[in-house]
Design a protein with these regions (language model features):
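ABC ATPase nucleotide-binding domain helices that frame the ATP-binding cleft
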Residues: 68-71, 167
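Conserved ABC transporter NBD signature motif
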Residues: 83-91
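ABC ATPase nucleotide-binding domains
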Residues: 56, 95-257
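The feature captures the beta-strand-to-loop junction immediately N-terminal to the Walker
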Residues: 60-62
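Helix-to-loop junction immediately C-terminal to a conserved catalytic motif
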Residues: 75
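Non-catalytic connector elements of ABC transporters
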Residues: 2-13, 17, 262-264, 272-382
Length: 382
C-alpha cells in the first residue's frame, strides 16, 4: 500500500512539474494527444500543439477538418475522447466553460437584442457578481478599446454589422480572459467590412498582448492576421508554422494546394544536392530543380510545387533566358494577369503576372519564355 501511495505521489509531482514548466515557458495553451470521436467518426485524431502566450494563432482548414471541434474543446464546449488540454499550465478538462480562463466569440455573435450595448458588454460581469462600480469602469474601458465610446445606450438592432462585431469583442474582452477563442467571427460580413475587422482584431490583439485562437477556412484571412497557423485536414494537423513557412515551404500536397495557388509537377530526382537545391526532372525533360526534400523516396519521385506568382513571363522575342512555351489562355484578373502556358515538353504551367507592361501586351497564342528560381520550387515526397 505504501509503495502504491508513493508511486501516486511521484506521478502527481511529475504532472505538477510539467504543468509549471509549460506555464513558465510562455505557453498559453498546450494540446496533448487530443482525440475526439462522434461515433465511428474521428473529428480529432491525436492532435498535439502548443500556442504561445500573446500570439495570434489560427486554425485553418476546410469544413469538417476538426478546427471548430478543437476550438470548442479548448473552451469546454466539447469533451475530448482522449488526451489533455492545459491553459496557463493547468489541465482544464474538469472545468466547465465558465470556469476556464477563456471567452469565445461565435460567428453569430449571440448578442441579447433586449439589452443595450452597455448591458450586453457587462452581462458576464453581472453573472459573476462583480462589483457594480468596478464593472461599470471595465465596461467603459472595453467600449473605448473597441472604439464604441458613446454607444453604450444604443440597442443592438440600431448597430451596423461591424459595430455588432465590436460589441461581441468588448463583451469577451471585458472579462480579461487568458485566451480569446474566435470561431469564424467574420464569416457573415461582406468583403470590405471583413477586411476592416481583420485590421481591428489584429490591432486589438497587439495592443492587449493577448492570446487569440482564431478559426477560419479563409487562407487570406489567416495569412494576414496570424503569427502562426495550424493547417488541419480530416482531424489531423498537417503543418504548423508562420504564414511564410506555410506558404513558401508546404509540408505536403494538401498544404500546397489548400494554401495559395501552385503548379504541381510530378518529377523525379536526377542528381545530387548542392546548396540545398536538388536536381529534378519532369516529363519530357523539363528541369524543375528545387529545394531538397527532407526525405527521399526509394524511386526518387517528388512533387515540384511552383507558385503561380513565382514564374516570370516574357515575350519570346525579348531574348531572355527561360523555358520556351506558348500561351493557351490569358485571364484578366484586375491587378494581375493569369497566363496558362504549355511548354515545349508539353507541361502545363500557370503564371500570375502584374497587370503592367510588358506582360499586359502578351496575348493568347503568343510565344513566351518562362523563368523562375530553383529556390522558389519546393520538392515534396509526401
Amino acid at each position: 500500500m505504501g509503495t502504491l501511495q508513493g508511486g501516486l505521489r511521484k506521478v502527481v509531482a511529475r504532472v505538477s512539474r510539467e504543468q509549471q514548466e509549460t506555464a513558465a515557458e510562455g505557453v498559453a495553451v498546450s494540446i496533448r494527444h487530443v482525440g475526439k470521436r462522434f461515433g465511428s467518426v474521428a473529428a480529432l485524431d491525436d492532435v498535439s500543439l502548443e500556442i504561445r502566450r500573446g500570439e495570434f494563432f489560427s486554425l485553418l482548414g476546410p469544413s469538417g477538418c476538426g478546427k471548430t471541434t478543437l476550438l470548442r474543446s479548448i473552451g469546454g464546449f466539447e469533451a475530448p475522447t482522449e488526451g489533455d488540454i492545459l491553459i496557463e499550465g493547468r489541465s482544464v478538462l474538469h472545468l466547465a466553460p465558465y470556469e476556464r480562463p477563456t471567452n469565445m466569440i461565435f460567428q453569430h455573435l449571440a448578442l441579447f437584442p433586449h439589452l443595450d450595448v452597455r448591458e450586453n458588454v457587462g452581462f458576464g460581469l453581472r453573472m459573476k457578481g462583480a462589483d457594480r462600480t468596478d464593472s461599470a469602469r471595465r465596461v467603459e474601458e472595453a467600449l473605448r478599446l473597441v472604439r464604441l465610446e458613446g454607444y453604450g445606450e444604443r440597442r443592438v438592432d440600431q448597430l451596423s454589422g461591424g459595430q455588432r462585431q465590436r460589441v461581441a469583442m468588448a463583451r469577451a474582452l471585458v472579462n480579461d480572459p487568458a485566451v480569446l477563442l474566435l470561431d469564424e467571427p467574420l464569416g457573415a460580413l461582406d468583403l470590405q467590412l471583413r477586411l476592416q475587422m481583420q485590421e481591428e482584431l489584429r490591432r486589438l490583439q497587439r495592443q492587449l498582448g493577448a492570446t487569440f485562437v482564431f478559426v477560419t477556412h479563409d487562407q487570406g484571412e489567416a495569412m494576414a492576421m496570424s503569427d502562426r497557423i495550424a493547417v488541419m485536414s480530416a482531424g489531423r494537423l498537417q503543418q504548423v508554422g508562420t504564414p511564410a513557412e506555410i506558404y513558401e515551404r508546404p509540408a505536403n500536397r494538401f498544404v500546397a494546394t489548400f494554401v495559395g495557388h501552385a503548379n504541381l509537377i510530378e518529377a523525379r530526382l536526377t542528381g545530387g544536392v548542392a546548396g540545398g537545391i536538388a536536381e529534378a526532372e519532369a516529363a519530357g525533360g523539363l528541369t524543375v530543380s528545387g529545394r531538397a526534400p527532407t526525405q527521399r523516396s526509394a524511386d526518387g519521385a517528388v512533387l515540384a510545387v511552383l507558385r503561380y506568382e513565382k514564374i516570370r513571363v516574357r515575350a519570346a522575342e525579348a531574348a531572355e533566358p527561360g523555358v520556351p512555351a506558348t500561351v493557351i489562355e490569358r485571364t484578366y484578373m484586375g491587378s494581375s494577369l493569369r497566363f496558362t502556358c504549355r511548354t515545349a515538353e508539353g507541361v502545363l504551367l500557370t503564371a500570375d503576372s502584374p497587370n503592367a507592361a510588358p506582360e499586359r501586351d502578351i496575348g493568347e497564342g503568343a510565344a513566351v519564355r518562362l523563368s523562375w528560381s530553383p529556390a522558389d520550387i519546393a520538392l515534396l515526397t509526401d
